[in-house]
Amino acid sequence: MSLPKIIQGRGCAPGAFEGELAVSLQPFGFWQGLDPQTGIVIDRRHDLCGTSLRGKGFVFPYGRGSTGTPGIFLEAVRNGCAPAAIVNVKSEPMIVACALLAEAFFHVSIPIVDGLPADYQELLRTGDRVWIDGASGIIQVLSGR
């Protein structure tokens, strides 16, 4: 029996998550990319188009977007349809603001970890079950393919 895989990133927003991942190879913009009523990716050019992010750990290289990102994200949080954790190669301020505002307005912790290596798709895959600590930056793969 092999031990779980542990990946050390950088903690950007505190909180803990245990659950399933949705892993994308493309940057993501929440504004016009996520339906905040359903949590489904609606950007037709995105590799996760049609996938629900609701309650999942969402892994993508970096955000693509605007200052509207936190507004869409907060609407998804309010509707119970937001990703429950975010993991990036590089998290920019608008992504981190999503987690901080979710905590401030709705008392919902959305852990964020960045600092993944560029070849993260070799380490994390859609459907993997993980534990994420947003304070320490630790990602532990519990099960997967």
What are these regions (language model features)?
Residues 3-14, 21-140:
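Feature captures the catalytic cores and cofactor-binding loops of soluble hydro-lyases/lyases
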Residues 142-145:
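Intein/HINT protein-splicing elements and their conserved insertion hotspots or analogous self-processing inserts
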